[in-house]
Amino acid sequence: MNIVNSKILFLSFTLLLLLQSSIVESDSICLSSGVASTVAMAAPGSVQKGDEEWRAILSPEQFRILRQKGTEYPGTGEYVNFDKEGVYGCVGCNAPLYKSTTKFNAGCGWPAFFEGIPGAITRTTDPDGRRIEINCATCGGHLGHVFKGEGFATPTDERHCVNSVSLKFTPAASSL
């Protein structure tokens, strides 16, 4: 077997293991061992596009973060020190993700929220088990990571560390 075939086999096996071991959960969706519970919002993955379609509607930086799981530099995002009332949605598909009432200042350099809108966020444990990735449940866009037990005085003791580039803010007057 040549080296290219070996790498493809290794990557395929790794992906299979990740799919079998990943747990995706949110407030109104829980996928574990292939069994799904009730979904209150649009079904996960209901907005599906190829890379070329995403590139046509996203800026290069949005594509890098949402579709390639990138991270913006800390302190550079539009919504880090933003405190207006409204809803933060996915910049890729416009699905509502977070209410402004759940945003707090974690001092981490990225917008921080203590919970998402029920059914809007999926969670997947990274392969090394150290972090939990959060994605838009509707289009699968990468948002950032969630951290638990850091001692913040929030109702959930969770910090959703979200890339500003992944978000689109809608003021309260025209939001949900």
Swiss-Prot record:
Q: Supply the alphabetized keyword list.
A: Disulfide bond, Electron transport, Endoplasmic reticulum, Metal-binding, Oxidoreductase, Redox-active center, Signal, Transport, Zinc
Binding-site list for Zn(2+): C90, C93, C136, C139
The record describes how the cofactor is bound as:
Binds 1 zinc ion per subunit.
Q: What class of enzyme is it?
A: oxidoreductase
| Pfam families recorded | SelR
Task: Output the PROSITE patterns linked to this UniProt entry.
Answer: MSRB (PS51790)
Domain MsrB: residue ranges:
51-172
Record EC number: 1.8.4.12
Q: What is this protein called?
A: Peptide methionine sulfoxide reductase B3
Originating species: Arabidopsis thaliana (Mouse-ear cress)
Q: What is the lineage of its organism?
A: Eukaryota, Viridiplantae, Streptophyta, Embryophyta, Tracheophyta
- Gene name, please? MSRB3
